[in-house]
A protein has these predicted regions:
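Conserved non-catalytic scaffold segment of RNase H-like nuclease domains
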Residues: 1-65
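Short, surface-exposed amphipathic charged segments that create phosphate/polyanion-binding patches used
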Residues: 18-20, 102-110
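Amphipathic alpha-helical interface surfaces
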Residues: 40-51, 70-73, 77, 94
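Substrate-recognition/cap helix-loop segment adjacent to the acidic, metal-dependent catalytic center
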Residues: 52-55, 68-89
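Acidic, Mg2+-coordinating catalytic module of metal-dependent nucleases/exonucleases
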Residues: 58-68, 72-73, 106-144
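Short, flexible loop segments at boundaries between secondary-structure elements
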Residues: 86-106
Length: 144
């Protein structure tokens, strides 16, 4: 999977904001999740370029836990930096919607890795999507 830790300064330089609620939320998380504050940082622009390179082409399907938060913020960051968004808007998917489909609500997998680490959360969500798909459509579970 793809993971980068982005500097706060590079976000603030483009007038991106950090809410007080978000800071309070982070202070309430476990030590393992807070380790993100001690990682080597990249600029937002570098992270966006590397994500584009990792995605590779615009046929990529992008998922997030909510259609109106992560993907729009990421798309806005691309626009601010003058970088083309590496996915087409019609290839955006919502994990929250998928996990609440009829017949899927009881399918919950245990957390994988560090709770609230972006890569761990993404991996767990991808595993859950595969399990839901297998349950709803009778297919063998795909591996992520």
């Amino acid at each position: 999977g793809f993971y980068r830790s982005i500097s706060v300064e590079s976000n603030l330089a483009y007038k991106r904001r950090i809410s007080e609620d978000t800071l309070i939320w982070w202070f309430k998380q476990g030590v393992s999740a807070q380790a993100v504050f001690h990682e080597n940082k990249e600029t937002l622009e570098t992270g966006l370029q590397e994500l584009s390179d990792w995605i590779g082409n615009d046929k990529f399907t992008i998922w997030s836990n909510g259609a109106d938060f992560d993907i729009p913020m990421l798309a806005h960051a691309y626009t601010q930096h003058g970088i083309e968004t590496p996915w087409k808007f019609w290839n955006s998917r919502c994990y929250r919607t998928y996990k609440n489909l009829p017949g899927a609500k009881d399918i919950r997998l245990p957390a994988i890795g560090v709770k609230h680490n972006a890569l761990s959360d993404a991996y767990q969500q991808a595993q859950t999507v595969c399990a839901i798909h297998a349950e709803l459509f009778g297919k063998k579970k795909a591996k992520v």
